A protein has these predicted regions:
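Intrinsically disordered, low-structural-confidence terminal and linker regions
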Residues: 1-25
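Phosphate-binding site of ATP-dependent enzymes
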Residues: 154, 182-275
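Glycine-rich phosphate-binding loop of ATP-grasp-fold ATP-dependent ligases
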Residues: 156-188
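Short catalytic/ligand-binding loop motif for oxyanion handling, primarily in non-cytosolic enzymes
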Residues: 134-138, 165-169, 234, 248, ...
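Conserved N-proximal alpha/beta basic substrate-recognition cap immediately N-terminal to
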Residues: 18-148, 164, 308
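C-terminal active-site "lid" helix and adjoining low-complexity regulatory extension at the edge
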Residues: 281-309, 313-320, 327-361
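A short catalytic or substrate-binding loop motif that flags glycine-/basic-rich loops and adjacent residues
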Residues: 150, 162-164, 216-220, 316-317
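Short, flexible loop/turn elements at secondary-structure junctions
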Residues: 131, 160-162, 176, 204-206, ...
Length: 361
């Protein structure tokens, strides 16, 4: 008990910047005093053991934001993330023994995820090569081996098989013997050294629909869709949003400076995008391409939502999943299913999600 308290106090000290004033995501509103902000955060800490890391993206700094209104949000972020993780480790829809046979491996191992989806006939990028322990564990016949990867014209994306938040991912292009990583000319030796430095998956690069490319052409901009399975086995979709990268970046992740925008029931974007603290606040248009978000229609949105709901029914050992779905000219393609998705992105664009709490008790 004492050890746990000491650890939390150390974490509180490391997060002391959260007690100060930061850039507001609602600059037009009247704001709380620093004393009120500190009071709110300390109340979170003593009630839950954590500060609220997304206090400002949620607009808690607005003077009009009451304690009751803050209570409509799922807070604090970190405690809920642990709860999501716990439920995906042992889905309450199973008994204690069955629940230990977790389905998380299908989400956390991107190679297994690919095999599972391909067997079921769901569209997902083809795996060209899987490098594990410094050796090519699996190679598609089109490349045959790690060395063969560089003797075939290809457009691919490489990522760590257990990676998160876009870390380590890069675009790989080979054409007439010229090799490029994220657009820059390089050598086969350099790429090979990078691939054997971790367990890497190399997949076909997804060509996105022109409506998505217009927002940011340098990366694949993906829908982030969320589903949760109740104890009766029914799957519910919630909190849809679009992740948009920044020009020059190979990934669209919020943690890499990307912009997230909520999606309404008709498949159109909300009127403002949100950036992660440290990268900016809000914007009504893309910072680089200047495409206005309000009412921007996304193709194949309803097809994408129906696809992930049907797939979650088959991944029944997962309690909840955050899906990354690309939109191509021919329809949705499932990139990943994340078992440690973040409520912060959803509430930053959709507002309070307290009505979902009963699924996570």
């Amino acid at each position: 008990m004492l050890h746990s308290l000491i650890l939390k106090l150390k974490w509180l000290v490391s997060c002391r910047k959260l007690l100060g004033r930061q850039a507001s995501y609602y600059p037009e509103a009247a704001h709380k005093s620093r004393l009120r902000i500190v009071h709110d955060q300390l109340r979170f800490f003593f009630k839950y053991g954590y500060l609220e890391e997304y206090y400002y993206p949620y607009g808690f700094d607005r003077a009009e934001m009451t304690r009751a209104q803050m209570g409509e949000y799922i807070v604090p972020y970190r405690a809920f993330l642990y709860r999501v993780d716990q439920l995906n480790f042992q889905n309450p829809g199973f008994d204690a023994y069955e629940g230990r046979m977790t389905g998380r491996v299908l989400n956390q191992d991107k190679f297994y995820f690919f095999l599972f989806l391909r067997q079921l006939g769901y569209p997902t990028p083809r795996v060209l090569l899987y490098v594990r322990g410094g050796k090519d564990l699996y190679a598609d016949p089109s490349v045959s081996s790690l060395e063969g990867l560089f003797s075939t014209d290809l457009d691919a994306f490489a990522k760590p098989v257990g990676g998160m938040m876009g870390a380590g991912g890069f675009r790989l292009q080979v054409r007439h013997g010229e090799i490029r990583v994220d657009g820059n000319v390089t050598t086969a030796e350099s790429v090979a050294a990078r691939l054997v430095s971790a367990d890497y998956l190399v997949q076909d690069y997804v060509v996105q629909h022109e409506r998505l490319s217009a927002l940011c052409p340098s990366c694949v901009n993906t829908l982030r869709l969320h589903t949760v399975m109740d104890q009766d086995g029914k799957v519910h979709a919630f909190g849809p949003l679009l992740r948009i990268g920044r020009v020059g970046n190979a990934v669209d992740n919020w943690a890499k400076g990307g912009v997230i925008v909520g999606i309404d029931k008709s498949g159109r974007l909300f009127d403002r995008g949100v950036m992660k603290p440290g990268y900016g606040t809000v914007t009504v248009e893309h910072p680089d391409t200047h495409v206005v978000f309000a009412g921007y229609e996304l193709p194949f949105y309803h097809e994408a939502e129906a696809m992930v709901v049907s797939l979650h029914r088959l991944m029944y050992r997962n309690h909840s999943i955050g899906w990354d779905v690309a939109i191509t000219p021919h329809g949705p393609v499932i990139i990943e299913g994340n078992d440690r998705w973040e409520i912060s992105m959803i509430q930053a664009v959709h507002g309070p999600m307290g009505h979902l709490k009963h699924y996570f008790q």
